[in-house]
Amino acid sequence: MIALDTNILVRYLVQDDPAQGRIATRLLEGELSSDNQGFVTIVAVLELDWVLRTQYGFSPQIVSDTIFGLMSSPHLTFENSDAIKTALGFQHGDLADNILHETGAANACTRTVTFDKKFSRLAGVELLT
């Protein structure tokens, strides 16, 4: 298994640097396989979300669809994929907050607490006042 840095995923998806795009494509479409998978950490997913939205102007829905697409690859394994999939399905809040909440729930946390009013609208998240 090979851990993939966020910039590999960005170059593969965006293809804005021709040389690096070709290298990333060769890795993801040629070298990786079911026996030699790429590993994508939660940190890389969060960075990918941020980069695609802030640097490339992708909408949250396009980012979500893009990450779901990557997750469907049999050549990629995602850290805590269930939490990522659930977090991507939420209609509000940002991905980092949603993954934080889902990861907590998956680790037997009974609630998530925050000072963030928007985040507190999610079921199971409590606004501390």
Predicted regions mapped to residue ranges:
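Short, well-structured N-terminal submotif of metal-dependent ribonuclease cores
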Residues: 1-40, 55-60, 121-122, 129
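Conserved glycosyltransferase catalytic-site signature
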Residues: 6, 81, 97-98
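Hydrophobic helix-cap positions at the C-terminus of alpha-helices
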Residues: 30-31, 70, 107
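Membrane-interface junctions
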Residues: 34, 90-93
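Acidic catalytic patch
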Residues: 41-45, 64-91
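Active-site-proximal, substrate-binding regions of enzyme catalytic domains
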Residues: 49, 53-69
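Acidic, PIN/NYN-like endoribonuclease modules and their adjacent C-terminal/linker elements
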Residues: 101-129
